[in-house]
């Protein structure tokens, strides 16, 4: 699937799906964005133990398919595990999905879908 330069140029924002500490840190770093009314969509989702998987999947789908202004989706790896089937099936170049560690959950490269694809590509 070829991606046009115009499509890549329009993708100027980051999105984040993460725990409260990760999202807060990234918002303080300046990634926060809300689209113009009437929909006023945020580019982040704070996930806790009470957040159901359907809400996480809906945010992931919104950031990866509906929003054409998102270039990178950052997601805590332990949250990506909750919707692993969605993360693993996302193969588009834009937006790129990157799994990041959180304060309480260390990064495990064996679970990262991007690294697994790279290993498969190089025959490891």
Curated annotation (Swiss-Prot):
Q: Which GO terms describe its cellular component?
A: membrane; vacuolar proton-transporting V-type ATPase, V1 domain
User: Which UniProt keywords are listed?
Assistant: Hydrogen ion transport, Ion transport, Membrane, Transport, Vacuole
Its placement in the membrane is given as: Peripheral membrane protein
Is Transport one of the keywords? yes
> By its UniProt entry, which InterPro entries does this protein fall under?
ATPase_V1-cplx_f_g_su, ATPase_V1-cplx_fsu_euk, ATPase_V1_fsu_sf
Question: Which GO molecular-function terms appear in the entry?
Answer: proton-transporting ATPase activity, rotational mechanism
Q: Which residues cross the membrane?
A: none
Q: Which Pfam families match?
A: ATP-synt_F
Reply yes or no: does the keyword Transmembrane helix apply: no
Location in the cell: Vacuole membrane
How does it associate, per the subunit comment? Answer: V-ATPase is a heteromultimeric enzyme composed of a peripheral catalytic V1 complex (components A to H) attached to an integral membrane V0 proton pore complex (components: a, c, c', c'', d, e, f and VOA1).
Looking up PANTHER family in the UniProt record yields:
V-TYPE PROTON ATPASE SUBUNIT F, VACUOLAR ATP SYNTHASE SUBUNIT F
Q: According to its UniProt entry, what is the function of this protein?
A: Subunit of the V1 complex of vacuolar(H+)-ATPase (V-ATPase), a multisubunit enzyme composed of a peripheral complex (V1) that hydrolyzes ATP and a membrane integral complex (V0) that translocates protons. V-ATPase is responsible for acidifying and maintaining the pH of intracellular compartments.
Family classification:
Belongs to the V-ATPase F subunit family.
Name this polypeptide is given = V-type proton ATPase subunit F
Name of the gene: vma-7
């Amino acid at each position: 699937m070829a991606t046009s330069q115009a499509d890549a140029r329009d993708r100027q924002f980051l999105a984040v799906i993460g725990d409260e500490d990760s999202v807060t840190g990234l918002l303080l770093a300046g990634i926060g964005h809300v689209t113009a009314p009437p929909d006023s969509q945020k580019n982040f989702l704070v996930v806790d133990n009470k957040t159901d998987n359907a809400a996480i999947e809906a945010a992931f789908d919104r950031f990866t398919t509906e929003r054409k202004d998102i270039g990178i989706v950052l997601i805590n790896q332990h949250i990506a595990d909750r919707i692993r089937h969605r993360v693993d099936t996302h193969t588009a170049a834009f937006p790129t999905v990157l799994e990041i560690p959180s304060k309480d959950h260390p990064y495990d490269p064996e679970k990262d879908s991007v690294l697994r694809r790279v290993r498969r590509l190089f025959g490891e």
